[in-house]
Design a protein with these regions (language model features):
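Hydrophobic alpha-helical
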Residues: 1-24, 46, 145, 182, ...
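Structured segments of extracytoplasmic/periplasmic soluble domains
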Residues: 4-5, 25, 29, 48-56, ...
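Structural detector of well-ordered beta-strand residues that form the stable sheet scaffold
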Residues: 12-14, 34-35, 93
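Extracytoplasmic "Venus flytrap"
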Residues: 123-144, 148-151, 156-179, 183-192
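Short beta-strand elements at the ligand-binding edges of bilobed clamshell
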Residues: 28-39
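A generic structural signal for alpha->beta connector loops
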Residues: 10-11, 30, 89, 151-155
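Short, solvent-exposed loop/turn elements at domain surfaces
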Residues: 23, 98-104, 134-139
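Hinge/cleft segment of the Venus flytrap/periplasmic-binding protein
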Residues: 44, 48-123
Length: 201
């Protein structure tokens, strides 16, 4: 309703997530949106796992090129040493560059090269997304993960939660021993024990 009014009155509308509808609206005279660089987010999620499984430096394929030539430039991510965390950096989507964001599930070209299976054998990963009904997570983030898992030789089992209860997710982690790695996206950030208790069995 607000978007219709703002369009009729020539008032720019600003959004977040750079979902396809928000990007498409820019071509119709809306203001702009912000991309969370989901392509880089998804890559970092699985790249950190791949590096741990390979026993290589954590920065491999991120700030330092890997053996396939995958590397990120410093303007799309940041590493915070005190948090031991990588973050993708937001980017403004405007009338000048919106065409680059019309498909939010395209992998980031600088990190789109296939890893060699002999040097990086397939590993099995359990990965959950806390809310399968979330538009950004289900229509952008997970499709990107599914493209990168092939490039990184990861056999990922995806578990979608209900966004409400941890047990909806943990009940589907019945045999942790069959996986090589885990990527856990908690419903509540103080519920880590729900997962570590299962992994310690």
């Amino acid at each position: 309703m607000f978007n219709a009014w703002s369009k009729d009155n020539g008032v720019p509308t600003f959004g977040y997530d750079a979902n396809s509808d928000a990007v498409a609206a820019i071509a119709e005279g809306y203001g702009g949106t912000i991309s969370q660089h989901a392509d880089v987010q998804a890559y970092l999620t699985l790249r950190v796992l791949r590096n741990a499984l390979d026993g290589v430096d954590v920065d491999t394929g991120i700030g330092t090129a890997d053996d396939a030539g995958n590397v990120l430039s410093s303007d799309v991510y940041v590493y915070k040493e005190d948090e031991r965390s990588y973050y993708s950096l937001n980017v403004a989507v405007t009338a000048d560059n919106y065409k680059d964001f019309t498909d939010s599930t395209v992998v980031w070209e600088p990190v789109s090269k296939q890893l060699d299976a002999s040097a990086h054998p397939t590993k099995k990963v359990w990965l959950n997304i806390y809310n399968a009904s979330d538009n950004f997570l289900s229509s952008t983030y997970q499709p990107l993960l599914q493209k990168y898992d092939d490039l990184l030789n990861l056999d990922v089992e995806y578990i979608g939660g209900d966004g409400q209860t941890e047990s909806n997710i943990t009940n589907r982690l019945g045999n942790p021993g069959q996986y090589d790695a885990f990527a856990i996206n908690m419903v509540k950030t103080d519920n880590a024990a729900s997962y570590t208790a299962l992994l310690n069995q």
